[in-house]
Curated annotation (Swiss-Prot):
Known role: Catalyzes the ATP-dependent phosphorylation of L-homoserine to L-homoserine phosphate.
GO annotation, biological process: threonine biosynthetic process
E.C. number: 2.7.1.39
Residue sites binding ATP per the record: P83, V84, S85, S86, G87, L88, G89, S90, S91, A92, A93
Record field: catalytic activity: L-homoserine + ATP = O-phospho-L-homoserine + ADP + H(+)
Family membership noted in the UniProt record: Belongs to the GHMP kinase family. Homoserine kinase subfamily.
Keyword Cytoplasm applies: yes
Keywords: Amino-acid biosynthesis, ATP-binding, Cytoplasm, Kinase, Nucleotide-binding, Threonine biosynthesis, Transferase
GO terms under cellular component: cytoplasm
SUPFAM superfamilies reported for this sequence: GHMP Kinase, C-terminal domain, Ribosomal protein S5 domain 2-like
Family annotation (NCBIfam families): thrB
Protein name stated in the entry: Homoserine kinase
One example GO MF annotation: homoserine kinase activity
């Protein structure tokens, strides 16, 4: 059996912890239960960037605690096409794949919605894992255990600039302030509402004018010297729009001149994936 889980980008600037978008780049995970011991093999472009496979085991143990079902031994072969720790949902892809595998191995007792709630609880926020399941642009709401979302299917291509350094999501969240100026909050509300209004009106490219943010990006950028240099180089190209993908360090922008951008490793031109996770026998 095989499951393909898409890369995701989140926040889209103004929509902090609310907007998530699935992309047409997939980690491919083949698995079978004809084994006596769980083994995990990783190949693909970004396999060498993985430190370990502990997240798979962490998800399996979490699934067992929450459901009471025991995940049987499984043989896993993962093709890593999503950059690791780069703000493109590599961890979310593992969580979604591992939960699917665990559910398959224990009799398919949980619905997609059940798995989604487990993924959100494990990840801590919904904006990566929900679009990985559903595809498309997702507007998420979470309040305690209550999860709600709406999905928009959109036709859009985006370019992501991936640097050769990584950033830890948890560490980047610690940088964020507990309080922000009132006018900064209003700025983000205006932009996120107008972004969504343009999406709802079918004016997809116009929506990208409203990705401006004052709640999280500057804190993350200024908290890392390499990140600051990387973003400043991109901004020096006078882009029409830009935003940090997730907690970084990848940046989405529409610049065409890549010369002189320090630390640049990959340029990924990706379309929105409106299907989400793909499962095949």
């Amino acid at each position: 059996m095989k499951v393909l889980v898409p890369a995701t980008t989140t926040n889209l600037g103004a929509g902090f912890d609310v907007f998530g978008l699935a992309l047409d780049l997939f980690n491919e995970v083949e698995f079978s239960f004809d084994t006596k011991e769980t083994t995990i093999e990783s190949t693909g472009k970004y396999a060498s960037d993985l430190k370990d496979h502990n997240l798979f085991f962490e998800v399996f143990r979490f699934f067992e605690r929450k459901t009471g079902y025991r995940v049987p031994p499984v043989r896993i072969k993962q093709t890593c096409n999503i950059p690791v720790s780069s703000g493109l949902g590599s961890s979310a892809a593992v969580i979604v794949a591992a939960l699917h595998i665990a559910n398959e191995g224990t009799g398919r007792n949980l619905s997609r919605e059940d798995l989604m709630k487990l993924a959100v609880e494990l990840e801590g926020h919904p904006d990566n894992v929900v679009p990985a399941f559903t595809g498309g642009l997702v507007v998420c709401y979470q309040n305690g255990s209550h999860l709600d979302f709406e999905k928009f299917e959109i036709d859009l291509s985006l370019t992501f600039f991936v640097p050769n350094f990584s950033m830890c999501t948890n560490e980047m969240r610690k940088i964020l302030p507990e309080k922000v100026p009132f006018e900064d909050a209003v700025f983000n509300i205006k932009n996120s509402c107008q972004f969504l209004a343009k999406i709802a009106a079918g004016k997809i490219k116009e929506a990208l004018k409203y990705v401006g943010d004052r709640l999280h990006q500057n804190y993350r950028i200024n908290g890392n010297k390499k990140m600051k240099e990387f973003v400043e180089a991109i901004l020096s190209k006078n882009p029409e729009y830009w935003f940090v993908s997730g907690s970084g360090p990848s940046v989405c922008s529409n610049i065409n001149d890549f010369e002189g951008i320090p630390y640049l490793k990959d340029v990924l031109k990706l379309r929105v994936n409106n299907r989400g996770m793909i499962v095949s026998e």
